[in-house]
Swiss-Prot record:
Domain of life: Bacteria
Gene, per the UniProt record: ppa
Lineage per the UniProt record: Bacteria, Pseudomonadati, Pseudomonadota, Gammaproteobacteria, Enterobacterales
Family: Belongs to the PPase family.
Biological source species: Escherichia coli O6:H1 (strain CFT073 / ATCC 700928 / UPEC)
Name the record gives this protein: Inorganic pyrophosphatase
Matching Gene3D superfamilies: Inorganic pyrophosphatase
Binding locations of Mg(2+) 1: 66, 71, 103
The keyword Ribosomal protein appears for this protein: no
Record's function text: Catalyzes the hydrolysis of inorganic pyrophosphate (PPi) forming two phosphate ions.
The UniProt record lists the keyword Metal-binding: yes
EC number from the UniProt entry: 3.6.1.1
Length: 176
């Protein structure tokens, strides 16, 4: 099955499928799955010597305000392969703005059927403070050496805000 056929989730917005593009702690290469072919492309080599602190991907059949599918960070005990799909539940959102406009990043944890390790995490405030700081720091600085690019992190919002973002983005894609 093509990644293009992966549904947005099992029970939106509570139970979502995240298509992974970049594994946690991988080399500083930004991969993107082409939304027309489903192929994994190298988007760019990051200029900063930094790595994504969590697996990074998106929710199919959604459309964020930046014109792309909803971005999602997924902490896991092990890095996930690019092109893999993981069942998750949203727990929060990191609100940010970059040179192109609003660019929110959802945080979602693996579904309980995949791991009980995250069952106690119901909201972004249940995540370890160090992990939240690493995520914010990464996004504040990963574009520092790219001319004309910048990011401003505005702060964390809760699970309800993440779910609202999913619903709005799913509707936006459906009505496009």
């Amino acid at each position: 099955m093509s990644l293009l056929n992966v549904p947005a989730g099992k029970d939106l917005p509570e139970d979502i499928y995240v298509v992974i593009e970049i594994p946690a702690n991988a080399d500083p290469i930004k991969y993107e799955i082409d939304k027309e072919s489903g192929a994994l492309f190298v988007d760019r080599f990051m200029s900063t010597a930094m790595f994504y602190p969590c697996n990074y991907g998106y929710i199919n059949h959604t459309l964020s305000l930046d014109g792309d599918p909803v971005d999602v960070l997924v902490p896991t005990p092990y890095p996930l392969q690019p092109g893999s799909v993981i069942r998750c539940r949203p727990v929060g959102v990191l609100k940010m703005t970059d040179e192109a406009g609003e660019d929110a990043k959802l945080i979602a944890v693996p579904h309980t059927k995949l791991s009980k390790e995250y069952d106690h995490i119901k909201d972004v405030n249940d995540l370890p403070e160090l992990l939240k700081a690493q995520i914010a720091h990464f996004f504040e600085h990963y574009k520092d050496l790219e001319k004309g690019k910048w990011v401003k992190v505005e702060g964390w919002e809760n699970a309800e805000a993440a779910k609202a973002e999913i619903v709005a983005s799913f509707e936006r894609a459906k009505n496009k």
